[in-house]
């Protein structure tokens, strides 16, 4: 079996090359009955984009599965839990993703498990491999000797300081068969390309017409830039407000845009605020009067006044537990874990990007593209100089047509990633 990998800067067509390579493999080795292509990535946003790419190939939807690595690992652990118990491990809780992946990797060390996986999925595609933690990388390494493995990665797009040096990228380079891509395809705007290249190379990005770095000491000034930009933007374009952290500065800007009008008469504008399921669930639990023991008959009352989709999913779960297992009481910890899983499921099923304006973090914007990008750069950002360059690079490279960086602190403009 072979390992082929594609690496290079953002927007250079790594995922495109993955799909082209997959098409070539399928021509040389058509799938047999019961076989599927397995496409894996770390985050749900990347999974949705990968799923869209797979749907465009001349391959039946029944012949591929697109999943996060965590979901695949959970499926593996559940299927082989008897073996897991026999080697002295209890099945990890559904929300303990790191342990689930570690257990899945340990199971794949057993030949019977690896051969089962290889028979079901003789071709495995992995996107955004630079984000793989050691346990997730171990899953891919166990599969590598038994499947056709196609991988895309870019070490500089890894936003976790804990993954430096990047073991996944080092392993892929050491395996050989790596194609390094350099030609950008996401945008042909010279200013955007030059700014991204400068940040990546540790040099100061230069402002121009389509790329600008602006000092905006207060939320009102930053919001005015964005609100005017939204109004002057062509209808139908996808606009993103991207920030390293959704802190006070970003939230104040978001509120201003949605409630105020600029001196030029622009605004207010509706902005879809994207948050991680962890943040949303934490806020949901804070507002929930959750008892230590929940009676099944009280589940509906507990969900009153809360988002209908989550409330409905939770009460249906309680009803299933009551009907199938005769349960009438649930602990606080069990309820919290179930709600966290429901929020995660909801994020997984969200649709792709459409026209409009959305606010999100750099992490949430990974592997996505927008016509117009505004980057909110707050005064305080954690991490070393390299980390800050990676954050800014990942934000700038989401833009296809224009990007404006709005820095809260003038002092920040005299330090990396701006110098």
For every predicted segment, state its role.
Residues 1-419:
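The feature marks helicase ATPase cores and/or their adjacent C-terminal helical subdomains
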């Amino acid at each position: 079996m072979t390992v082929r990998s594609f690496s290079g800067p953002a927007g250079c067509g790594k995922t495109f090359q993955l799909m082209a390579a997959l098409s070539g493999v399928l021509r040389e080795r058509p799938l047999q009955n019961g076989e599927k292509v397995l496409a894996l990535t770390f985050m749900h946003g990347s999974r949705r984009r990968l799923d869209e790419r797979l749907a465009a190939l001349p391959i039946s939807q029944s012949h591929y599965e697109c999943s996060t690595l965590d979901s695949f690992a959970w499926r593996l652990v559940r299927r082989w839990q008897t073996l897991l118990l026999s080697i002295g491990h209890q099945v990890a809780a559904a929300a303990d993703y790191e342990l689930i992946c570690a257990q899945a990797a340990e199971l794949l060390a057993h030949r019977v498990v690896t051969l089962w996986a290889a028979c079901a999925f003789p071709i495995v595609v992995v996107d955004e491999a630079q984000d793989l933690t050691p346990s997730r990388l171990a899953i891919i390494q166990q599969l590598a000797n038994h499947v056709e493995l196609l991988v895309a990665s870019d070490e500089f797009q890894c936003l976790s300081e804990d993954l430096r040096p990047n073991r996944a990228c080092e392993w892929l380079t050491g395996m050989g068969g790596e194609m390094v891509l350099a030609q950008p395809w996401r945008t042909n705007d010279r200013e955007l390309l030059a700014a991204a290249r400068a940040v990546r190379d540790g040099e100061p990005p230069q402002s121009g017409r389509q790329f600008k770095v602006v000092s905006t000491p207060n939320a009102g000034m930053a919001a005015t830039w964005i609100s005017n930009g939204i109004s002057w933007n062509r209808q139908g374009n996808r606009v993103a407000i991207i920030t390293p952290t959704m802190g006070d500065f970003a939230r104040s800007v978001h509120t201003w845009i949605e409630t105020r009008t600029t001196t030029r008469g622009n605004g207010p504008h509706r902005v879809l605020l994207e948050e991680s399921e962890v943040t949303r669930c934490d806020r949901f639990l804070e507002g929930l009067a959750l008892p230590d023991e929940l009676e099944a008959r009280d589940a509906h009352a507990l969900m009153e006044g809360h988002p209908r989709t989550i409330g409905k999913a939770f009460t249906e779960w309680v009803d299933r537990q009551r009907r199938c297992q005769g349960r009438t009481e649930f602990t606080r910890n069990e309820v919290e874990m179930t709600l966290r899983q429901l929020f995660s499921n909801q994020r997984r099923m969200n649709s792709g990007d459409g026209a409009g304006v959305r606010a999100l973090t750099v992490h949430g914007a990974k592997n996505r593209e927008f016509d117009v990008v505004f980057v909110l750069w707050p005064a305080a950002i954690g991490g070393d100089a390299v980390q800050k360059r990676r954050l800014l690079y990942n934000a700038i490279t989401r833009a296809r047509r224009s990007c404006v960086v709005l820095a809260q602190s003038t002092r920040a403009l005299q330090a990396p990633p701006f110098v």
